[in-house]
């Protein structure tokens, strides 16, 4: 079954929506963005999630100590690194997280896909998952742009945990899942109306993913 991550949650009603439709992951943005949440708000929202929905914190070029502090304070399950973090940064972050929490925290690394060569960096990292997003000049993600899914499909064929992001929405996600066969899909703006999460779009998105998997929404 393809996992679903609904990203950019910032309101209590957003949590109500994901608790109703039950994606596997819920994302909270701590980088500069209109969807950015404070650690206090994130802690409240994470606590309101159903226990089976894992929380993911999105960080861009943040200090390791700050990431670890936020993870401990909010109770996050996963860290998504969406900037220019290096393999050395990842290893040091793992060590730091291991010292401050008994829970194993997953680490995901985002890769901004421009061409085939931009994917070569994957071999340098030891992380739990890679999130493939479209390369957009001057942006670290969340731009709603689509990239060549064939590039993602080629990577997904050789990696168990590839998460597809970038311009996904209820209209195109079924085709994307069928073509790429990723471990998971990630959506933010594609399930929003006027800049806020839309319950019907979240439902439709997850339903289309399940259709691609050959099943139906439970």
Swiss-Prot record:
InterPro entries listed in its UniProt record:
Aldolase_TIM, PRAI_dom, RibuloseP-bd_barrel, TrpF_fam
Top-level division of the source organism's lineage: Bacteria
Q: What class of enzyme is it?
A: isomerase
The protein's UniProt keywords, in alphabetical order, are:
Amino-acid biosynthesis, Aromatic amino acid biosynthesis, Isomerase, Tryptophan biosynthesis
Q: In which pathway does it act?
A: Amino-acid biosynthesis; L-tryptophan biosynthesis; L-tryptophan from chorismate: step 3/5
Q: Looking at the keywords, is Amino-acid biosynthesis present? A: yes
Q: Which reaction does it catalyse?
A: N-(5-phospho-beta-D-ribosyl)anthranilate = 1-(2-carboxyphenylamino)-1-deoxy-D-ribulose 5-phosphate
- EC number(s): the record gives 5.3.1.24
Q: Does the keyword Acetylation apply?
A: no
Alphabetically, the GO molecular function entries are: phosphoribosylanthranilate isomerase activity
SUPFAM superfamilies (alphabetical)? Ribulose-phoshate binding barrel
> What GO terms describe the biological role, i.e. biological process, of this protein?
L-tryptophan biosynthetic process
The record's Pfam families line, in alphabetical order, gives: PRAI
Describe the family membership recorded for this protein in Swiss-Prot or TrEMBL.
Answer: Belongs to the TrpF family.
The record ties this protein, via PANTHER family, to: N-(5'-PHOSPHORIBOSYL)ANTHRANILATE ISOMERASE
Q: Which HAMAP family does the UniProt entry name for this protein?
A: PRAI
Name-wise, this protein is N-(5'-phosphoribosyl)anthranilate isomerase
Q: Which organism is it from?
A: Acetivibrio thermocellus (strain ATCC 27405 / DSM 1237 / JCM 9322 / NBRC 103400 / NCIMB 10682 / NRRL B-4536 / VPI 7372) (Clostridium thermocellum)
Q: What is the lineage of its organism?
A: Bacteria, Bacillati, Bacillota, Clostridia, Eubacteriales
Q: Could you tell me the gene encoding this protein?
A: trpF
């Amino acid at each position: 079954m393809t996992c679903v991550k609904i990203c950019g949650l910032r309101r209590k009603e957003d949590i109500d929506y994901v608790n109703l439709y039950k994606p596997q992951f819920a994302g909270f943005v701590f980088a500069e963005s209109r969807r950015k949440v404070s650690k206090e708000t994130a802690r409240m929202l994470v606590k309101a999630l159903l226990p089976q929905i894992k929380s993911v914190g999105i960080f861009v070029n943040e200090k390791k100590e700050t990431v670890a502090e936020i993870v401990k304070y909010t109770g996050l399950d996963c860290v998504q690194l969406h900037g220019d973090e290096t393999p050395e940064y990842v290893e040091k972050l793992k060590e730091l997280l291991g010292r401050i929490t008994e829970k194993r925290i997953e680490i995901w690394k985002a890769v901004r896909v421009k061409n085939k060569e931009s994917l070569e960096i994957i071999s340098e990292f030891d992380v739990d998952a890679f999130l493939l997003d479209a390369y957009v000049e001057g942006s670290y993600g969340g731009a709603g742009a689509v990239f060549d899914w064939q590039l993602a499909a080629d990577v997904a064929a050789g990696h168990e945990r590839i998460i597809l992001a970038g311009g996904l929405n209820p209209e195109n996600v079924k085709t994307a899942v069928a073509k790429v066969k990723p471990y998971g899909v990630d959506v933010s703006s594609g399930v929003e109306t006027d800049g806020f999460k839309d319950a019907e779009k979240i439902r439709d998105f997850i339903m289309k993913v399940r259709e691609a998997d050959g099943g139906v929404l439970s």
